[in-house]
């Protein structure tokens, strides 16, 4: 019999209580916690143990914590509302509905009752457990009632909840205990209830107890369930993985050669599927020997930050709670009053110790990874380490809660069923023999650490196998080509579902995207097949910019802009075509027919590749598998290639009638005309061509997402293009290839949207970027240069000319200000121009201009009059020399802005007169207190008084004006800390010269020490 246990607790929105609850859950045998009023601020690692999953309601009033690695958790989005959170959990104990709700005392109870009705209705015959802070008392859940209870509000709420429980035919698990579930020194009651439906009542027997808790007004409830019938548990082997940190590659090679040599002489003539299976087994065995299997260990139940002081503080709180209970039993009001005062003091001290210890642990953790910008801290802050759960799905208005059924729905959504089987293809000629260099080229191009397929073998291992036994692998691939057979094991991907966006409805199957993780050896064979077809492939349409080496989004947009600008027509109408599930719906018969038309010599192998395919979703509780009969496998080598050769047919048909741009499945048609009627007629004609092609290959268009917009000219009434019996939507702006374009080919809307898009990224990382104990300055610069700036500057060669406008520059400055405030330890009132210099970040409009000119020089396009290097003789310069010259122009333009006395940031200019200081030195950094002096914005009465944060501008020394210069150069209160000569500060008449301080590391450290000591002393004063 498999036990099932969980905790129920109300944290009172306390950080210390939530931290300690996480520790209790990790240390105990419980798997889940039904929590009311949790603390949800801060970082994941700052509050809860690593690996613990959290599901909350919309208000953050209730949460479910999951500390069971093997449990499948399916959030029920339709039942995760303002009133509670619901989860379907599946594991060795079976399938159970868990629900947590906080029934707010000053809110009516009826909405919560309706919510619980919905939970019970959805659970039906599945066991359901509801953990409530009901703020209600009743004999039904054995509340210990006084004789005055009937007149109280929580008693009337209890009567209402009791009536509902009788009508709903549910039961309370509460048992009689001496300890109250609620005890806040002033009052005691039993207002917490654990409710189960009929299915849960029959499913198990329960032990329900209350344990005293020092950190909340509520005590902790622990429930242990023992199922009445034992279940046979099927063990699902996880995808194997190995440790590469201490890999012994020489031993790996020796073992591979030895194991292959032990195979029978006639093994090369055995069935291909058997050879593939044997190769996998050998590779697994050798990896176990030379690399070592990466074991899935349960998280440590020990809290490394728990100290002896915490234990002592907890003992003191428990001692005082016992004294309080003794005093209440004796009705000794005087003793109770004294103990309550002591208990409050001890509880506050204990909570403070817990918060400080956990924060110190988080700081140590961040400090240990401070120099790794893309490591564990980054992934935690960005949410990259959180598991992607398959939630409950809605199909035809009905909610599906079984994990297996949901997995099948997703697989069917990812891989639609073909209406007809692919025809048998017969190879008309014998494929040429496989050359070793073909395999070597394909293996070398593998990404080493890409996620593996079901066999767990990644690119690193494949390359090692190729180095060890090249003849054996080449022979295996050669036989596949010769026999025209693609091994079945290599055609079965492991499918991972990803939510398309945070704003998508998690209950809709269409909100997910399926990624196929294929076996790496199969990818090598696919690459060989694709390369062979490319050898006989004629040149495709020149306006396809996706899947083309050396082409990019900027190329596609430049073609669009030049076509619109060069058009002799009065109007140009852009038709942005959207294919519904483009890659997923391709008919294999169309792909085979196209391959045959191209003269492919491996038709038998391609036919085998497109037959007998399967797709698998695997978890700890089961495996779901469906046959695949159509579509280009996303994540495969051949998928983009197949789409490319099919879409080339469409582009060739459209090319005589219009200008166009295609990037993978993103298609833009440019319809030219001198009147609305011409635009409408030509637009309908072109859409008819697209529709015909879609029917041939099995794809259809999305009539709601295919939109039109005027890119040139203006009409009083927008054109109406008919397609599939309806008008295509006309829009004022449209996002194409990651860039938002507005009517008339304008990009100000795109620039205006950048700040909002970056808010989430900055918010997730700001806490470890801004903090003095967070990332190192070099890591911060790496994240800025490698993540934030590229996100903002994506497609800069397309829209950089718009950045010359004053409105656009203001928008870009606002966006950059948001980013730099998230990266630098400064006051939020510091000017943007000063932030740019302190962060070594050039203004974004100048950075965009730099990227645009680099793009033009790379492609050989002519420079325009406002471009840097325009008119200069750069023909004799190398590429590196050109980049250096461009950087000089960037710095000069930036320096000119910085030297403008009308700009703010003049205090910072006195310390850093040249913009290259931080720009050239990625390790340049400073603390918050140092920034007070460098910017003049900080803890100075003159500064604070100007913002109504201080009653006076005077210093404590008596000087009438306390500002940064007074603190640094004159205040007698800090004379013993001041060393102006050591800092290199000079005085010329009435002026102080500070510009040499930050040029020297020793002086910079002295300034930092001075700032720390001064502002600590000032705070004490």
Curated annotation (Swiss-Prot):
Domain Reverse transcriptase: 479-741
Domain of life: Eukaryota
Chain intervals for the UniProt region annotation (Gag-like cysteine motif): 955-971
Gene name tied to this protein: R1A1-element\ORF2
UniProt name for this protein: Putative 115 kDa protein in type-1 retrotransposable element R1DM
GO biological process: DNA biosynthetic process
PROSITE patterns: RT_POL
Organism: Drosophila melanogaster (Fruit fly)
Molecular function GO terms recorded: catalytic activity
Pfam families: Exo_endo_phos_2, RVT_1
InterPro entries from the UniProt entry: DNA/RNA_pol_sf, Endo/exonu/phosph_ase_sf, Endo/exonuclease/phosphatase, RT_dom
Alphabetically ordered keywords of this record: Transposable element
């Amino acid at each position: 019999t498999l036990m099932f246990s969980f905790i129920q607790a109300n944290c009172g929105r306390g950080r210390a209580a939530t931290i300690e609850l996480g520790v209790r859950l990790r240390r105990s045998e419980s798997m889940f916690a039904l929590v009311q009023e949790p603390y949800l601020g801060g970082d994941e690692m700052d509050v809860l143990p690593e690996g613990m999953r959290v599901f909350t309601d919309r208000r953050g009033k209730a949460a479910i914590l999951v500390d069971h690695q093997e449990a499948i958790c399916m959030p029920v989005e339709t039942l995760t509302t303002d009133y509670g959170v619901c989860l379907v959990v599946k594991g060795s104990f079976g399938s159970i509905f868990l629900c947590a709700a906080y029934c707010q005392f000053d809110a009516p109870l009826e909405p919560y009752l309706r919510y619980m009705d919905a939970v019970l209705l959805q659970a039906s015959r599945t066991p359901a457990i509801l953990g409530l802070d009901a703020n209600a008392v009743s004999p039904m859940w054995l509340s210990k009632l006084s004789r005055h209870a009937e007149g109280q509000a929580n008693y009337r709420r209890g009567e209402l909840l009791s009536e509902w429980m009788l009508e709903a035919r549910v039961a309370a698990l509460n048992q009689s205990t001496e300890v109250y579930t609620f005890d806040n020194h002033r009052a005691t009651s039993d207002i917490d209830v654990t409710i189960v439906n009929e299915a849960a009542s029959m499913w198990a027997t329960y032990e329900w107890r209350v344990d005293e808790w020092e950190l909340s007004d509520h005590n902790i409830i622990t429930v242990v369930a023992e199922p009445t019938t034992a279940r046979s548990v099927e063990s699902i082997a996880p995808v194997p993985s190995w440790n590469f940190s201490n890999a012994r590659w020489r031993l790996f090679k020796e073992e591979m050669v030895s194991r292959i040599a032990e195979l029978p002489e006639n093994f090369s003539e055995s069935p291909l599927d058997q050879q593939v299976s044997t190769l996998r087994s050998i590779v697994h065995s050798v990896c176990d020997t030379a690399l070592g299997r990466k074991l899935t260990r349960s998280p440590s139940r020990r809290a490394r930050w728990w100290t002896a002081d915490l234990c002592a503080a907890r003992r003191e709180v428990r001692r005082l709670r016992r004294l309080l209970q003794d005093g209440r039993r004796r009705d000794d009001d005087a003793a109770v009053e004294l103990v309550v005062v002591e208990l409050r003091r001890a509880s506050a001290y204990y909570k403070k110790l817990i918060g400080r210890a956990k924060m110190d642990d988080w700081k140590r953790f961040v400090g240990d990874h401070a120099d790794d910008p893309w490591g564990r801290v980054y992934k935690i802050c960005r949410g990259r380490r959180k598991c992607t759960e398959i939630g409950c799905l809605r199909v035809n208005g009905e909610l599906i809660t079984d994990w297996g059924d949901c997995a099948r729905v997703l697989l069917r959504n990812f891989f639609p069923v073909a209406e007809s089987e692919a025809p048998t293809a017969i190879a008309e000629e014998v494929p040429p023999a496989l050359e070793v260099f073909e395999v070597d080229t394909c293996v070398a191009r593998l990404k080493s650490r890409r996620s593996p397929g079901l066999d767990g073998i990644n690119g690193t291992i494949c390359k090692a196998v190729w180095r060890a036994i090249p003849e054996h692998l080449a022979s295996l691939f050669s036989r596949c080509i010769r026999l025209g057979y693609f091994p079945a094991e290599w055609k079965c991907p492991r499918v991972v579902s990803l939510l398309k966006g945070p704003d998508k409805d998690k209950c809709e199957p269409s909100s997910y995207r399926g990624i196929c993780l294929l076996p790496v050896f199969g990818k090598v064979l696919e690459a060989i097949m694709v390369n062979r077809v490319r050898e006989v492939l004629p040149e495709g349409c020149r306006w396809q910019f996706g899947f083309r080496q050396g082409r990019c989004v900027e190329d596609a947009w430049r073609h669009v802009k030049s076509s619109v600008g060069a058009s002799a027509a009065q109007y140009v109408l852009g038709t942005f075509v959207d294919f519904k599930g483009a890659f997923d719906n391709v008919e294999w018969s169309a792909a085979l027919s196209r391959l045959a038309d191209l003269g492919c010599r491996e038709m038998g192998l391609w036919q085998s590749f497109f037959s007998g395919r399967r797709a698998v979703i695997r978890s700890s509780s089961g495996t779901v598998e469906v046959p695949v009969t159509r579509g280009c496998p996303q994540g495969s080598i051949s998928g983009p290639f197949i789409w490319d050769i099919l879409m080339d047919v469409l582009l060739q048909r459209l090319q005589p009638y219009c200008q166009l741009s295609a990037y993978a499945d993103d298609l833009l048609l440019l319809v030219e005309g001198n009147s609305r009627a011409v635009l409408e007629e030509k637009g309908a004609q072109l859409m008819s061509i697209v529709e015909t092609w879609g029917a041939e290959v099995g794809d259809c268009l999305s009539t709601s997402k295919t939109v039109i917009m005027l890119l040139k000219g203006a009409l009083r009434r927008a054109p109406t293009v008919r397609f599939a019996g309806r008008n295509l939507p006309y829009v004022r702006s449209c996002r194409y290839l990651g860039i938002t374009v507005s009517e008339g080919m304008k990009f100000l809307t795109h620039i205006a949207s950048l700040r909002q898009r970056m808010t989430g990224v900055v918010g997730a990382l700001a806490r470890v970027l801004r903090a003095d104990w967070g990332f190192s300055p070099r890591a911060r610069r790496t994240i800025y240069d490698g993540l934030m700036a590229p996100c903002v500057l994506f497609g800069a060669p397309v829209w950089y000319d718009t950045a010359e406008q004053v409105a656009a520059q203001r928008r870009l400055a606002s966006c950059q200000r948001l980013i730099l405030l998230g990266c630098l330890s400064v006051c939020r009132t510091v000017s943007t121009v000063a932030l740019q210099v302190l962060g070594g970040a050039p203004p974004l409009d100048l950075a965009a201009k730099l990227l645009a000119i680099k793009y033009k020089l790379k492609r050989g396009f002519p420079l325009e009059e406002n471009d840097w290097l325009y008119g200069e003789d750069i023909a004799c310069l190398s590429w590196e020399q050109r980049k250096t010259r461009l950087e000089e122009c960037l710095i000069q333009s930036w320096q000119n802005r910085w030297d403008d006395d009308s700009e703010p940031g003049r205090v910072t200019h006195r310390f850093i007169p040249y913009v290259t200081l931080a720009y050239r030195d990625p390790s340049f950094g400073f603390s918050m207190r140092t920034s007070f002096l460098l910017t003049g914005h900080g803890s100075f009465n003159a500064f604070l008084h100007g913002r109504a944060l201080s009653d006076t501008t005077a210093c404590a020394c008596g000087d009438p004006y306390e500002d940064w210069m007074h603190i640094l150069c004159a205040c007698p209160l800090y004379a013993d800390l001041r060393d102006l000569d050591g800092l290199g500060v000079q005085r010329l008449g009435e002026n102080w010269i500070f510009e040499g301080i930050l040029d020297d590391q020793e002086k910079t450290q002295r300034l930092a020490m001075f700032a720390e000591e001064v502002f600590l002393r000032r705070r004490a004063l």
